[in-house]
């Protein structure tokens, strides 16, 4: 039973800096400060700020070239330094020095926020199309700068944006860090069959996919005992983050937090509405599947929460790390190209930190590091789902390899589009298995796949409902633990319905998910990514050669073009609900296959 990190790999960043005491690291911190100071001086020297509309001049072109070049130069080095620090803060929240350095770097980086606001106002004043005629740098960065110009319509005054940039480090950023620290350091006592055991909360949550029903229930009970210990602190953090977001969104002229989120993700409201309509109409089908899963586990009615991630009784035993890698390696190899070598490159290069341990944050993510190299963060539990998560995060790493030749301003990805490659790679693993397996093995894989789809469609919908209500109520007052718990239960009731045993619903999901502790909705973009990824995979299956001819370029342009423009490359109209219905139909077909296989048992 994999519960803690023993022999699993950890990433190695010592080739970049040997330690925080290394001269190279100290120089990198000094350089970040110096680069920001030079940027501030350059913006003042060139008077980069809102101006009266007028015809552009060659001097404007020279100013734009200088500013864009300097911004990219700063980000090239600063992004590496930030990732290096994060490689410690995310894996060891007990490391107080790393936490302090993260805060120090954050204060330096925050000084660029008002500069970005000034650049947005300046570009909007003169026109990005007009500036592109006199500035090669603007022409090269037309997409990101056009979006920046649009952002200028939703900015506070220059002074206010500058003040907010200074305050955010001690406001929402600090609140989010608090949630990460208190939850990552939490432990729980689990009544395991061989006796009680104290485990990091990340390892406890990993037991949700354990083969033994008694262990799953014990882990759930331990969670319910543990989360109240940090709930009050997390409620304060939630109120701080959402309260700040409401004020800033209002001062920036956004009609709602959702409008701000859609803009940040380069997704239009018609696209979002089409997707949401398809999601809501799919909920009854998901509820039916959850009840079918419940029957296979011997339950009547809805599925208990503690069995949401339960493997089927005949599912394969625990997947070893090496076997999980082989599953991903084989699936990536079926696609070919540079993706085929992604697993070995990440393993050999020690990009991956795989196992849970005390002080390590929960979840999984991938962050770009140096050149086209990434750092892949996992909490491997030994489940089949862990293998799919590994494929997902290595998909992000592959995406980063396709972005590496772009400038930092060109490769800043909105979340919805950042999920494109990760979902596609996860789907490769699922489809390869479905083609290879039959009978009970096929049913077991469908079970894992559909529980993932249910998370991204149904659970994410519950998170969206919850967060929407939190934003609304936070406009009037702060929310306590009991109220947040009630909102979470109601959101789960509305999304899951009779698909789960509502008596076992998880009221503390808002405590443990870091996604809530940010200004924007950190939920619906996952649904976008899943359904868009399924649409891409269908295109790949129809014409693999044509798909491969466009895919890498689309990935490299994810920070440049809108969601609608990227979809159009493959002939998709994402403003049309039919696209989203077709993607959900792929999931429905898997539910049908699940039911047929279950009936044949």
Name each region found by the language model.
Residues 3-7, 14, 18-20, 138, ...:
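C-terminal, non-catalytic "cap/extension" segments appended to globular domains
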Residues 253, 381-401, 422, 427, ...:
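Active-site recognition of the HExxH zinc-binding catalytic motif
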Residues 295-340, 399, 445, 450-456, ...:
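Long, K/E/R/D-enriched contiguous segments that form extended
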Residues 316-321, 334, 369-391:
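Short pre-active-site segment immediately N-terminal to the catalytic Zn-binding motif
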Residues 317-319, 352-373:
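Catalytic zinc-binding patch centered on the HExxH motif and its immediate surroundings
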Residues 330, 334-341, 367, 396, ...:
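Conserved helix-loop functional segments at active or binding sites
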């Amino acid at each position: 039973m994999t519960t803690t990190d023993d022999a699993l790999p950890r990433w190695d960043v010592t080739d970049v800096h040997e330690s925080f005491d290394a001269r190279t690291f100290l120089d990198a911190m000094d350089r970040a400060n110096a680069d920001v100071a030079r940027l501030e001086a350059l913006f003042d020297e060139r008077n980069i700020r809102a101006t009266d509309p007028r015809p552009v001049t060659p001097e404007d072109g020279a100013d734009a070239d200088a500013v864009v070049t300097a911004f990219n130069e700063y980000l090239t080095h600063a992004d590496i330094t930030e990732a290096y620090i994060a490689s410690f803060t995310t894996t060891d929240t007990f490391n107080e020095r790393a936490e302090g350095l993260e805060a120090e770097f954050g204060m330096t980086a925050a000084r660029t926020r008002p500069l970005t606001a000034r650049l947005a106002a300046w570009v909007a004043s003169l026109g990005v199309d007009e500036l592109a005629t006199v500035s090669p740098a603007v022409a090269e960065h037309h997409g990101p700068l056009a979006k920046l110009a649009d952002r200028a319509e939703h900015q506070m005054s220059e002074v206010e944006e500058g003040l907010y940039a200074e305050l955010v480090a001690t406001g929402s950023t600090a609140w989010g860090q608090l949630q990460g620290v208190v939850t990552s350091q939490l432990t729980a006592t689990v009544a395991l069959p061989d006796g009680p055991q104290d485990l990091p909360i990340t390892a406890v949550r990993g037991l949700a996919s354990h083969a033994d029903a008694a262990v799953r229930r014990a882990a759930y009970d331990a969670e319910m005992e543990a989360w109240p210990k940090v709930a009050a602190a997390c409620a304060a953090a939630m109120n701080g983050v959402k309260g700040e977001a409401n004020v800033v969104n209002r001062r920036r002229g956004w009609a709602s937090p959702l409008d701000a989120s859609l803009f940040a993700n380069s997704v239009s409201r018609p696209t979002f509405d089409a997707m949401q309509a398809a999601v809501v109409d799919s909920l009854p089908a998901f509820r039916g599947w959850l009840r079918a899963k419940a029957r296979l586990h011997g339950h009547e009615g809805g599925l208990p929460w503690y069995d949401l991630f339960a493997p089927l009784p005949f599912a394969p035993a625990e997947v070893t790390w090496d076997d999980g890698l082989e599953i991903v390696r084989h699936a990536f190899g079926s696609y070919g190209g540079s993706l085929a070598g992604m697993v070995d490159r990440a393993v050999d290069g020690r990009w991956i930190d795989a196992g849970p341990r005390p002080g390590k944050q929960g979840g999984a993510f991938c962050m770009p590091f140096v050149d086209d190299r990434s750092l892949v963060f996992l909490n491997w539990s030994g489940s089949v789902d862990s293998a799919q998560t590994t494929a997902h995060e290595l998909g992000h790493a592959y995406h980063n390899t396709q972005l590496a030749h772009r400038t930092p301003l060109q490769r800043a990805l909105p979340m919805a589009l950042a999920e494109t490659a990760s979902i596609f790679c996860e789907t490769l693993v699922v489809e390869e298995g479905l083609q290879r397996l039959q009978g009970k093995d096929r049913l077991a894989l469908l079970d894992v796949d559909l529980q993932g789809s249910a998370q991204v469609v149904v659970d994410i919908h519950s998170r969206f409902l919850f967060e929407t209500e939190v934003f609304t109520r936070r406009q009037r007052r702060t929310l306590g633990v009991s109220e947040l718990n009630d909102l979470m239960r109601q959101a789960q009731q509305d999304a899951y319905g009779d698909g789960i045993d509502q008596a076992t619903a998880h009221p503390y999901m808002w405590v443990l998910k870091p996604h809530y502790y940010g200004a924007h909705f950190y939920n619906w973009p996952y649904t976008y990514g899943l359904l868009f990824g399924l649409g891409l995979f269908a295109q790949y299956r129809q014409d693999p050669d044509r798909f491969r001819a466009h895919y890498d370029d689309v990935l490299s342009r994810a920070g440049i073009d809108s969601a609608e423009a990227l979809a159009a490359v493959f002939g998709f109209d994402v403003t049309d609900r039919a696209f989203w219905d077709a993607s959900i139909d792929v999931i429905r077909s898997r539910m049908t296959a699940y039911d047929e296989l279950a009936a044949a048992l």
